[in-house]
Amino acid sequence: ASGVSSTSNQWGQLLVSLISEGNPLTLTLSGTPWRSDSTKIALQSYSGEPQELDTDFVYGLGDAVRDKVCRRPSLILLDNSSIGVQENSETHKFSSIRQAIEAEKLKYSDLLTHQESLSQLMTYAHEELIRIREKHPRAAGLVVASSIDQARRISQFIITNFNESSIVVSYDQIDAHENIRDFQSSEIDWIVSIGMVSEGTDIPRLQVCAYLSNVRTELYFRQVLGRILRINLKTDEPCSLIAFAEPKLIEYSERINQDLPEDSMRIKVLEEQTLMKTTDSNQYAQSTVKNDFITMKTISSNHSHTFDSLHNIAPETSYSIKMAFCKDSYRTTILSL
């Protein structure tokens, strides 16, 4: 990659050189296909200008799926077809999350802290898990959260709204690794993680992942995806990763798709509800329901109001929502929520 440090892998190359002395063949392996920074991968060699990784053999996800040693994932990215951002008296409208983010009117972190957005994504993830459990009753779900506070809120949301069990594991827990080991053989439905369940964790019954991390590097995204790819007992086990249609995550998903076998895709829109987003702290949005649609009006107020349910919109953010169902999708699916 361009800008790769010329000194970052000197110790690795020295080690390979020492091992190679007197040996006709030397095999060096790496599970790291690239790094997001400029650091070279240890024990690997680079050539060319700009410096690129030298490989004699590459075994990717597509190979693993075709060899039936990994599950074939569904990558489901949830989007919005009608986003309204109100700044004081001016309203900006966008037809996608990408458009709103690129216009610098919406931040990815806004989606990760907005209760209604999280509720809709988690509801979709829950429905995916229910669908998979029709044939695989021990399947479980993973939520990769962006903060400890968010993780606790999501865990409570799962317990309260889905009547399912949930456990939180985070980097600040003394017994986090023990809790992960217990989860592997338990009947707990969901595990919500902050900086714990990523690289190297082996929990084959995980078949659904809700990606709600603030980290948007391709290596981390693929590492998280790997948590739901591990074959359990059967080779026909489905798995799904659900995330917001943030530009970088779309790019990574499309790259993963290029390596996967082709398959069919079906999308069905079940329901549409309209929300607005306002950034004016002196106003709040109030909703009314008519014929299964939510209509919005903005009312001046000197007080702050917070709502928790879908039909009482939180003041800080809201946007168009559709409930969608995608079955047997093995290609990246960008759905309008």
Regions found by a protein language model. Give the residues of each.
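SF2 helicase catalytic motif II
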Residues: A1-T28, T32
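Conserved RecA-like P-loop NTPase helicase motor core
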Residues: S165, S170-L270
